[in-house]
Amino acid sequence: MTVGNMESAALFDAGKKGRGLEATKELSAGEVVFTEPSFAAVVFDSFFSQVCHSCFRRQADLHRCAQCKFAHYCDRTCQTACWDEHKQECGAIRKIGKAPGEHVRLAARVLWRIHKSTGLASDSQLISVDQLQDHVSDLPEDDLKQLKADVNTFLGYWSHGRKKHSADDISHIFGIIKCNGFTLSDQRGLQAVGVGLFPNLCLVNHDCWPNCTVILNHGNQSALSSALHSQRRIELRALEKIPEGVELSVSYVDFLNLSADRQKKLKEHFHFECTCDHCSHHTKDDLMMATVEGSKADKVKEVTAFSKDYLEKIETSRVEGDYHHVVKLCSECLEKQENVLADTHLLKLRVLSVASEVLSYLQSFSEAADYAHRMVQGYTKLYHPNNALLGMAIMRAGVTHWHAGQIEAGHRMICTAYGILMVTHGPNHAITRDLESMRTQTEMELKMFKENELGYHTMRAAALKSQPTS
């Protein structure tokens, strides 16, 4: 599909929701509805030296811009590809002596781009950036104070001699970024490393049980011929069969929250009341709060309070890097929850998630696999069957089972995850390619295991001993 092609989607009046996009033809699960390069994007301050400012891949030994000494790139190819975006920024950073925060940098990039292209980067862009909603009038007092501080910082950063902007104009851009900024992940999808503005994507309305998902395609800058290079872009992909004329939707928040909590988050950040079917009917809230049959109300209340308190302690210990204490706290919390909270209860799932992650890090794979299995079973009952977060969780659980020597279970999970991520990410994404390699490897090992179990264990032990898992 050509980047920016909007033949599969069209703008329409979505009633109370305002504008929206609808399918102009029947779409299949995994089909790319449209792709869109960023109007502007920046790397987060905390990753400025660890992530390429062009393709947003995270890696070691990046090359630093010799002029501003702030921007970092994979190589000269990425630096050249990003020069149009970085040129004005580079001069501004040199002028004030340091780079401002990510929101100020993104606002400046947006305005530089507007000056260059009057807010429309291409013919396929359905709306100009300055027409996007800013919701500045809806911001609470604390957010307005922060906005004012950002505007003042911006005025000091904006180059002298350029077109002057009023505080209201700049506030409008900051408001647009706050409401419409899309978080960008690294090439493994494991870490949020930046934020960008994608005007056409901003037209896709929210649904807690959406029919589409968005992923970042980091592009290809490694081909020998520059004619084969492709730019960084988002892809809107169908999660299921979508008939012609049906509204396209994505989820702005993680579904793994009670409907009231999702509605609160959406109201606070995006300033609208969610009335989707899952919120209106409180769908799956019963599972997210499920208790073991026969549990008394006062016991449930006690365990719920205990779990919330322990989750705070667990997070504190994790931030401090005291992972053995994290495991101890998780074990105590799960023991308290046993026979009271069901495995689909959100509080239990959060403890299971941390426990499996930390135990895997500590290479206690058998115990980690047990927790991961329970976590995945709970997730499967709650998430959309093609949810990307579900796919990633099953993938990690599969790898954990493989490390634990549970080859058959690990292979089965990896195959399940592969099926989901083929829909959400497509066959060419780095995550899917890695998963395909794992799937092939575990399939081969499973075959070897069934043919010669003793020989397999001997070979595997030697391999793991020579290549310890980090």
Where are each of the predicted segments found?
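Short alpha-helical interaction motifs and adjacent low-complexity tails used for partner binding
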Residues: 1-470
